[in-house]
Amino acid sequence: MGVNEPPKGVITETVTDVFEDSALGSTDIALEESNGHRNVNKSSSTDAENMRRMGREQELVRNFRMFSMASFAAMATAVWEFALFQITPALVDGGRPSLMYSTIWNFVGFLPIYLSMAEMASMAPIAGAQYHWVSEFAPRSMQRVLSYVSGWTSTLALQAGNALGVLLVGTLIQTIIVVNVENYSAPAWHASLLVIAAVMIAFTGSVIGYKVLHYWQNAAFAIHVMAYFAVLIPIWVNAPEATHAQVWKGFENTGNWNSIGLAVLIGQLPGISFQVGIDAAAHMSEEVRNASTAVPRAMLLTYALNFVLLFPMILTACYHLPDIQPALDDSTTYPFVYILKQSMAAGWVTLILVIIVIILIGSNITFLSATSRDLYAFARDDGVPFSGWLAQLSKRQQVPQNAAIVTCVISFLLALIYIGSDVAFYAITSLFTVALLQCYVLSIGCILWRRIAHPDTLPYAPFSLGQWGVPVNSAAVLYGTWSFFWAFWPQSYPVTAEGFNWASPLFMAAVFAALINYAIHGRKKYFGPVSLVEGRKNE
C-alpha cells in the first residue's frame, strides 16, 4: 500500500463524519451504527478502520473534535504563561538578544519536527504516539528494544513535565504571598503542600470531571487569550523600557562562558522548551473524532498559535528589562514578576498572578490527561510493571483512572523530594525536555528510514508529506539532534552542583535502566505495537 493510497474500505468522508465543535467544546451525540446499535465510543468509519489496522479495540470515548483538541493542546502547553517563568537561563547566557533570537530560530527549527509528527499522527493516531511510531516504522530487528526504550523515556518525560507544571502553581502561589507579605520566606515545604493540592485539583478535573473536559477547552483557550492582553498592555503602558540596542544587540555573558557565541547557544534552552509538548494532542488521539485528520491539524494549528502569542510576550519582557541583574536578583526569583512590579501596584500584580495560576491549573488538568493516556497505552502493550492494572479503565468515567492515580502519586513523591532539596527535584524534572527530544528524534528517524528503505509499507495518511517527506524528516532529525545536544549544557561556568544540568546523567541512567529492564523482563512479554498491526504481524 502506498502512502498516497487510502486502504480499501476506508470511507474518507461521509455525512456522519462531519462533526463540528460546539461553542464550548464538542457535540455530545452518540451516532447510530449501521447494525442499529449505539456507537457509544463516537467513532467515525475512518477511526474504526484505523483502530482495526492497528489491531486495537476502541475503549475510550471520542469526545474531542479538531478545535477542542487544538484548544486542549494550547492549554496543555500554556506557552506564554510557562514561558514567562522560564526565561532566566537565556537572560544569564546571552541576555535579551539570546532570548529573542533563540525563540525565533527554535520556532523555525521545530517546523519540520511537528510536520513529521503530524504525518505520523495521521498514519497511526494512537495514544502511545512516539513509542508506537518507533515500533511500526523501525527496522524489524530493532523495533522491540527501540520502542521499549522510547516508551520508557516518553513516560518519564511526561511524568516529569506533569510534576513541573504543578510545582509552578505551588511556587507562584508562594510568589503571590511574597509580593504581599514582606517577611514571608517561602519555605519549600509550603510549596510541596501547595503542589499536593494542585495535583488533587488536576485529578478531579481530569478523571472525575472527564465527561465535561471537552466542553470547556475552547472557553479555557478564550480566557488564555484574553488574559494574555490583560498582561501585555499594562506592561507596555507603564513599565520602564530598554533601548533597541539593548534588546537586539546587548548580548551578555553572566554565565562566564569563554565566548558570547557559546553563551547564546547554551542560553537557547528556554527557546527549545517553549516548543516541546504540543504532541500532547497525539496522546489523546483515541479520544478525537476523525483523529487521522483532526489531530495533525490541531497540532499544527497549536504550533502556529503558540508562536503568535509567545513572541510578542517575549518581546515585551525584553523591552521592559532596562537592567537585567536586579530582575535576576528579585526576591521572587522570577524576572517577569520584577517586570510586573515595575509597571503596576502590588494589588494589580497579585491579580495578574492569580489569573495566571488559574490558567495553569487548567493546564495541569489537560497535561495530566495526556500523561495518563501515555502511561495507559504503554501498559496496554505490557511495557511497565503492573501493566494489567494500569491499563484498566474506570467503568464510570471510561478513562484510565489507575494510570492517572500513579501519575499523581509520582508528583506527590517529587513534591516531597522538593522539601529536602530543590536541586534534586529540578534534577529529576530536567528530564522533561531532553527525553521528549529523544522521542521526537527517534520516531522521526524511524519513519525516515522506512520512507527510504520500504516506502511501500507506509500506511495511508490523510495528512501526508508526500515527496517532501525525506527532506522534511531529515531536517527534523538534524534539528532535533542539535536541540538535544544543547539541552544538556549547564547554565554557568565553573559548574557547581546547584548549577549543573542533571539531565545528562539522569537521562543516561533512565535509558540504561530501561535496557536492563528490557533484558530481564521486557523481552519476555513486550513485543511492540507493530505485532498487532495489520499486514505487519508476521514480520
Locations of the language-model features?
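Transmembrane helix-boundary motif of multi-pass solute transporters/channels
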Residues: 52-168, 272, 280-281, 285-288, ...
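Membrane-interface "cap" regions at the ends of multi-pass membrane proteins
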Residues: 2-97, 115, 525-539
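Helix-loop-helix junctions that connect adjacent transmembrane segments
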Residues: 183-190, 218-344, 349
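TM-loop-TM module centered on a large, flexible mid-protein loop between adjacent transmembrane helices
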Residues: 132-143, 178-179, 254, 304-365, ...
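C-terminal membrane-solvent junction of multi-pass transporters and transport-like membrane proteins
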Residues: 190, 388-401, 440-505
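Membrane-interface loop-to-helix entry segments
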Residues: 190-248, 276, 299-303, 429-440, ...
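Helix-loop-helix connectors at the membrane interface of multi-pass transporters/channels
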Residues: 131-143, 166-193, 282-292, 297-303, ...
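Membrane-helix boundary/coupling elements in multi-pass transport proteins
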Residues: 126, 150-170, 275-287, 349-387, ...
